[in-house]
Amino acid sequence: MPTIGVKRDLLFEALGKTYTDDEFQDLCFAFGLELDEVTTEKQMLTKEQGDVAAAANASEEIIYRIDIPANRYDLLCLEGLVTGLLVFQGKLKPPKFQFVELAKRQVLKIDPSTAQIRPYAVAAVLRNVTFTQASYNSFIDLQDKLHQNICRKRTLVAIGTHDLDTLQGPFSYEALAPDQIKFKPLNQTKEMTGSELMDFYSTHAQLKQYLPIIRESPVYPVIYDANRVVLSLPPIINGDHSKITLKTKNVFIECTATDRTKAKVVLDTIVCLFSEHCAQKFTVEPCDVVQPDGSVISYPELEVREERISVKRANAYIGIDEPAEKLADMLTRMYLEAKVDGDSLVVKIPPTRHDVIHACDIYEDVAIAYGYNNIKKSLPAFMQIAKQFPLNKLTEQLREQVAQAGFTEALTFTLCSRDDIGRKLNKNIDALPAVHIGNPKTLEFQVVRTTLLPGLLKTLVANRKMPLPLKLFEISDVVVADESTEVGARNERRVCAVNCNKTAGFEVVHGLLDRVMQLLSVPWKSASGTKGYYLQATEDPSYFPGRCANVMYDGVVIGKIGVLHPTVLQAFELTTPCSAVEFTIEPFV
C-alpha cells in the first residue's frame, strides 16, 4: 500500500477548512483511507538517517503521511486527494474532462525497431500550465509514486515529462544501438552515449535499480524530436534539454511501455490530475501516435465507461436497505456519477477511476460511502457447520504422533538456494521440477523447495553442539513444477525425518515409517495382491550406494528412505552420519 506525504497547511488550504488531527483522521477513515503518521520533514530525515545533525536544516512544517489503496492511482498526489475528498463531502461536483484541439496535433511516431525492447508508447499535452513550487513537487512526486506502483518500478511503464516549448514536433520513438545514442542526461553538463550512461549511473542511488531493465539489450529505446534532440532514454532518464521548470507552460507527456493498458491508465491519471493547473481547467490536448503498421491512435482516451448495477443486489451484498436515490447519491460522492433507471443504477466511471473493473468495485464504494461502522451486525440467514480441511487435520494428527515418537519438530523456510536442492544433494538443478524466483534478493532464497531435507540438514548444522542423537522432523509443503496445473506448479504435503548419531541408525527412520503407516492403518505388503506399503531398492545420488529404497504404496513411489551420502553431509558441514526418510502423505487423506 503506497503512502503519500502532504503538507498539512497546503492540504487544509486546498480543502478550504482547518481540521484537528483527529477530525482529519476520521475524514480519511470515512473515505476509506488511513492517516498513518503526523510528522515533519526534520523528524523523517532524523528517523531515516539516524543522525539529528543531518536534519538540522530540514523544515519543521507538519506533514501528513496517508496510506492510499494500491489501486487508487488518482489519490497519489495532493491534487487528486483534495478533489476526491471535496467530492466525497459534497463540496465539489466530479470534474468533466475535455479535449482541446489546436490547428495541428503533436505527433509521436513509433518505429518498428522498438518491438524488441518496449513496443508501446502514448502521449498527451497539457497547455498553459501554471506551476508553483508545491505543484511542481507534487507533479514530480506523482510520477515517482506511479513508477513504484502501477509501473512496477518502470518495468511496465516509464513516464517522461518535457517542456514542449523547447522542442519541435513531430516526435519519433526508436530503438538504437547504445553507442548511436548521445545526449546530455537530466541535470548533467556533458553528453554521454548509451553505454557511457550505463556506467555513469551504475552507482547512482536512485537510478541504478532501473539499469538492468535494458542494459543487456542490443538496442535502447530513445525518443527524438524533429531536430533529433533526445527527449528521454526510457526507462532510465530524461534529457536535460527539455527538463520541466517552474517557468514551463506547455508540458509534453510521453509514456513508453511493455503493457499498453497500463500505459493508458498512467497517462489518463497524470493528465486528469494535473489538468487542474491549466488555464482552462480539466482540458487536455490529444496527440496522434502513429503505430508501426501506419495506423494512428489518439491519446489520451479519457473514456467514460458505463456500468449498470442492481439496486437490490447492492443492498443485499452490503447488508443494508437503502432506496435507489440514496445509493446514487453515495456513488456520486465516491466520484462515480450514478442515475436511477428503474430498479437499476447506471454508473458513469470517469477516466480517473481505472480501479473500477467490476460491479463488485462499485458495491465496495457504496459500502465506503455508507460507512462500514453504520452497517448493522446480523447473524447469517443460514447455519453451516465448518470443519477442518482433511489434509490439514491429518497433518496436525501426525505432528503430534511423530513428536511422541521422540522426534523434534522443525519449521524451516519454504525458499532455499539452488545449491541446497541441487549441488549439495548431488543433483542437477536443471533436471529438478523446481520453481525459480525471478528476482531473488539473496542467494539463500532462489527457489521454492522441492524437498524438506535441506531445511532439516541446515537445522542440524545450527544445533550440532547439542548432544547426540538429534532426531528432527517436519511435515509441510514442497512445491513442484507441473505444467498440467493452471499456475504451472502444485503443492505437495510431505513428512520428512532425519536421525543424526554416531551411527546412521537406518532402523530409527525405518521404525518411524512403520509407526506412521500403522497410524494411517496401512499394512505392510507381505504378498502379491495385497494392498499396502513396502520398500523397493533403488539408487539415489543423495543417499549412500546400496542403502537407499523407494517407499512404495499401491505400486506408486511416494518417497525415499536411506542413509545419506557422505558428500551430502560434507556439503552441509555435518560430520556425523545421518539417515532420512521423506514421503508424501496426500494419498492417505
From Swiss-Prot:
What are the subcellular locations of this protein?
Answer: Cytoplasm
- What happens upon changing residue 158 to W? Reduced survival rate after 50 days of age
Q: What UniProt keywords apply to this chain's record, in alphabetical order? A: Aminoacyl-tRNA synthetase, ATP-binding, Cytoplasm, Ligase, Magnesium, Metal-binding, Nucleotide-binding, Protein biosynthesis
Q: Where is the B5 domain?
A: 302-377
Cross-referenced InterPro entries: aa-tRNA-synth_II/BPL/LPL (IPR045864), B3/B4_tRNA-bd (IPR005146), DNA-bd_dom_put_sf (IPR009061), Phe-tRNA-ligase_IIc_bsu (IPR045060), Phe-tRNA-synth_IIc_bsu_arc_euk (IPR004531), Phe-tRNA_synthase-like_B3/B4 (IPR020825), PheRS_beta_core (IPR041616), PhetRS_B1 (IPR040659)
Q: Which cofactor does it need?
A: Mg(2+)
Q: Which CDD domains match?
A: PheRS_beta_core
Which Gene Ontology MF annotations are present? aminoacyl-tRNA deacylase activity; ATP binding; magnesium ion binding; phenylalanine-tRNA ligase activity; RNA binding
- Please list the reactions this protein catalyses: tRNA(Phe) + L-phenylalanine + ATP = L-phenylalanyl-tRNA(Phe) + AMP + diphosphate + H(+)
Looking up Gene3D superfamilies in the UniProt record yields:
3.30.56.10, Bira Bifunctional Protein, Domain 2 (3.30.930.10), Phenylalanyl-trna Synthetase, Chain B, domain 3 (3.50.40.10)
Chain residues that bind Mg(2+): 355, 361, 364-365
Q: What happens when the gene is disrupted?
A: Lethal.
The alphabetized list of GO BP terms reads: phenylalanyl-tRNA aminoacylation
According to the UniProt record, one GO cellular component term is: phenylalanine-tRNA ligase complex
Enzyme Commission (EC) number = 6.1.1.20
Subunit details for this protein?
Tetramer of two alpha and two beta subunits.
Family under the similarity heading: Belongs to the phenylalanyl-tRNA synthetase beta subunit family. Type 2 subfamily.
Entry protein name: Phenylalanine--tRNA ligase beta subunit
Organism of origin:
Drosophila melanogaster (Fruit fly)
